[in-house]
């Protein structure tokens, strides 16, 4: 009888041990599963089309990460970040906005990098015939759309072009100012403005405008560089760094090139 009791007790102990191991294994598998992460990205309005493709591509390599993108003028986004709006990563269309955030200690400094370059172009509405900057002086050109130079990098670059080509004073009464480059594009595409200055990446993806002239950087405007940085107050700094690293991969850079951007050399 005692022998039988010992056998039963031994079997019971083995069963409890196996159950314990199973629970531990189950706990380990749960802990190894990737937890869902939501990253808040603040991106210049001009990035809207390319970001859609980048989001889809990143989902394939990090399916637990959801990218929530807030688009706007770079100056407006800068102010939102300063005021504490949720943001893990910022992609600006100009250095000025990023530099301001850096000076205020709001960035993870080692993550602040130049991502891609863009190009400024002069566009017109369909049916509007101009061939040069001087043609903007023509009496039939009533409205010329530009981004607000104070908050929109494309507007600042356009202002530099108008000053450096010597035509700003003669067309200043025709200028209409938009909150971001997408609004400039919409005004020209709809015919509400006769001409405007946008990025090449915007113009390439809109069949309702004509590209009149590509504006070279030399002597006409400063380089158009899109910097990127992780925000210091991010609650997901490591995940934000991983997404930033992805933006510099060959796959991501090819997506940028498809939309008219250039790799930053």
Task: Give the residues covered by each predicted segment.
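C-terminal motif of bacterial Sec signal peptides marking the signal peptidase cleavage site
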Residues: 16-20
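Exported/periplasmic ABC-transporter solute-binding proteins
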Residues: 21-56, 75, 79-82, 94-95, ...
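Conserved beta-strand core positions
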Residues: 39, 65-67, 120
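Conserved strand-loop elements at the edges of beta-sheets that form or border functional pockets
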Residues: 71
């Amino acid at each position: 009888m005692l022998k039988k009791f010992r056998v039963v007790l031994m079997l019971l102990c083995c069963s409890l041990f196996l159950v314990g191991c199973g629970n531990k294994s189950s706990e380990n598998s749960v802990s190894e599963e990737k937890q869902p992460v939501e990253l808040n990205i603040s991106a210049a309005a001009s990035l809207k089309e390319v970001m859609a493709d980048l989001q889809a591509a990143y989902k394939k390599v990090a399916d637990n990460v959801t990218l929530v993108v807030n688009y706007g003028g770079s100056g407006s986004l800068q102010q939102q970040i300063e005021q504490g709006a949720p943001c893990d990563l910022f992609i600006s269309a100009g250095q000025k906005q990023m530099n301001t955030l850096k000076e205020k200690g709001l960035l993870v400094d080692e993550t602040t990098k130049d991502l891609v370059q863009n190009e400024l172009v002069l566009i017109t509405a369909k049916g509007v015939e101009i061939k040069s900057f001087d043609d903007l002086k023509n009496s039939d050109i009533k409205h010329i759309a530009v981004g607000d130079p104070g908050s929109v990098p494309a507007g600042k670059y356009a202002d530099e072009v108008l000053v450096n080509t010597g035509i700003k004073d003669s067309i200043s009464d025709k200028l209409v100012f938009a909150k971001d480059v997408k609004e400039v594009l919409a005004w020209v595409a709809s015919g509400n403005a006769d001409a405007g200055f946008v990025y090449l990446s915007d113009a390439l993806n809109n069949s309702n405008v004509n590209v009149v002239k590509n504006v070279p950087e030399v002597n006409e405007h400063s380089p158009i560089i899109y910097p990127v940085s992780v925000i210091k107050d991010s609650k997901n700094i490591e995940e934000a760094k991983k997404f930033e690293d992805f933006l510099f991969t060959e796959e991501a850079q090819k997506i940028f090139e498809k939309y008219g951007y250039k790799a930053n050399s």
